[in-house]
Amino acid sequence: MSTLHYDTFPSPIGALSVAADDSGVHHILFAQNRYDAIGRARWLHNPDAPLVREAREQLLDYLHGGRRSFDLPLAPVGTPFQLTVWRTLAQIPFGQTWSYAQLAQAVGKPAASRAVGAANGRNPLPIVLPCHRVIGANGTLTGFGGGLPTKQALL
């Protein structure tokens, strides 16, 4: 893996960090992230790296209401199952929510709601891969790496 370049910047939902290399965006982190990114100590602060700059601009545009989707090359690292779940998150339309059961059905594993939930919780690209749009079966907001107030704000 090549060196990841990153920037941390203020946003309407708090500080965000974006890390990318030439292959795509690898991580988006909230200041209060539950899980730290692997290898973060080796990242180089470079806010002018092309994909870091583009991701920052698109995220801020989205968070200010000027965008509903993203056009970024993504490079998440995970298990084959996690990657399938994360790709499926991109199918949840803006302004809609899915339950974990709906996400499991869309992944093709209708009995795997808990495994889908675990993969959702490890999403390295929140907001862009909209894990915040996944809610409990009864419509309640459930865990989110950026915190439930942030999840509510994103919805």
Q: Which positions does each model-derived feature cover?
A:
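Basic nucleic-acid-binding alpha-helical/helix-turn surface characteristic of O6-alkylguanine DNA
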Residues: M1-A111
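Short glycine/serine-rich loop segments
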Residues: K109-L155
